[in-house]
């Protein structure tokens, strides 16, 4: 039987997912897959479809379709890759603008949710999230999937639990900011 804590965590996960999916976007970004792929192209510029496919956990055909939609919408451009057989993908100016807008909306929503906690509650939540994420990260591909929508700047600076686990490093401490 599910305990109350697990139930509440599931509800919070749905709240965050539903709010992210409800963010208005251009038609090409109507679904979470396209949004995740757009963000992955921004996080891993000049990467191949294969690298990005892993980051968003898609089959190769699904990744090709997602990229084609982003290219058609003028959000992503194809370039010649370092390996002439592969295509490198990068955000266009419009793609960068959309990625930034979606990231800002995500940041605001998460700040609103966490902002209802006092400092000591935030510290406890951060410690618990570090422990959960460090323990749940399975491998490098899973790490890319987990962090596919992250603003990785603040997390990497403090010691990202997902990145630490993926690299075989010890679980990081809570940041003391």
Predicted regions span which residues?
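N-terminal leader segment of winged-helix/HTH proteins
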Residues: 1-28, 175
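N-terminal helix-turn-helix DNA-binding core of bacterial DNA-binding proteins
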Residues: 20-62, 143
């Amino acid at each position: 039987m599910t305990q109350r804590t697990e139930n509440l965590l599931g509800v919070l996960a749905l709240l965050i997912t539903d709010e992210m999916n409800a963010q208005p976007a251009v038609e090409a970004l109507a679904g979470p897959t396209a949004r995740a792929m757009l963000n992955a192209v921004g996080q891993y510029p000049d990467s191949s479809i294969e690298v990005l496919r892993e980051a968003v956990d898609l089959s190769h055909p699904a990744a090709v379709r997602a990229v084609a939609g982003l290219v058609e919408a003028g959000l992503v451009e194809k370039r010649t890759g370092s390996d002439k057989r592969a295509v490198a993908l990068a955000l266009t100016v419009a793609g960068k603008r959309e990625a930034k807008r979606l990231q800002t909306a995500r940041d605001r929503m998460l700040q609103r949710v966490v902002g209802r906690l006092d400092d000591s509650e935030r510290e406890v939540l951060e410690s618990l999230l570090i422990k959960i994420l460090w323990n749940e990260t399975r491998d490098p591909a899973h790490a890319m999937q987990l962090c596919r929508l992250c603003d990785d700047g603040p997390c990497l600076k403090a010691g990202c639990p997902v990145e630490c686990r993926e690299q075989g490093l010890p679980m990081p401490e809570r940041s003391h900011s």
